Regions:
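Domain-level detector of nuclease and nuclease-like folds
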Residues: 16, 23-167
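An anion-binding catalytic pocket shared by soluble metabolic enzymes
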Residues: 1-17
Length: 167
């Protein structure tokens, strides 16, 4: 996702999650748009692409509610943990008028071998819960990046973000 200055101020409070019709046709997504907390209260809906990154367009922002962009994420990590901190940093980068324009923001999941967190096999047809999430922010004009790999855990606190940074 290529980003420029943050000029959007659309309401991004919508939490109407939905299945992506094309992905459903291809059988490439989870089977339910229900909240993960209904199955396990330690998890909630986590966005790979944050809704506020697209707040210059209501339509684009709401597309982040597609289940193809959502994964079970530790509630702590999502609300005030390390993942939330990366989202805040990206917003700060976009608001910094001294920074040159243009950055790419990429994110994804890493599925490991931890079967103890695979709570959504029946409820959402997810074979595995992501063990880690990653984010990369590439600053085009500076030819540099920030990158993090963060364990999908309630122990992944924002105050520890430096320890998740990758060279």
């Amino acid at each position: 996702l290529s980003m420029g200055r943050d000029i959007g101020h659309k309401n991004t409070s919508n939490k109407n999650y939905f299945l992506d019709e094309e992905a459903t046709t291809l059988d490439c997504q989870q089977s339910s748009s229900n909240r993960y907390s209904q199955t396990n209260s330690e998890y909630e809906v986590g966005r790979l692409t944050a809704i506020d990154l697209l707040d210059d367009s209501q339509k684009a922002a709401l597309q982040t509610n597609a289940m193809t962009n959502l994964v079970p994420q530790s509630k702590v990590m999502n609300r005030y943990g390390a993942w939330k901190r990366t989202e805040t940093l990206v917003e700060c980068y976009r608001d910094d008028i001294n920074k040159p324009l243009g950055m790419d923001v990429l994110s994804g999941v890493l599925i490991g071998s931890d079967i103890n967190n695979d709570h959504f096999t029946i409820s959402h047809s997810l074979m595995s819960t992501p063990d880690y999430m990653w984010k990369l922010v590439y600053f085009k004009s500076e030819n540099r990046y920030d990158a993090w790999i963060i364990k999908n855990s309630s122990n992944s606190l924002g105050s520890n973000l430096k320890s998740y940074r990758k060279p």
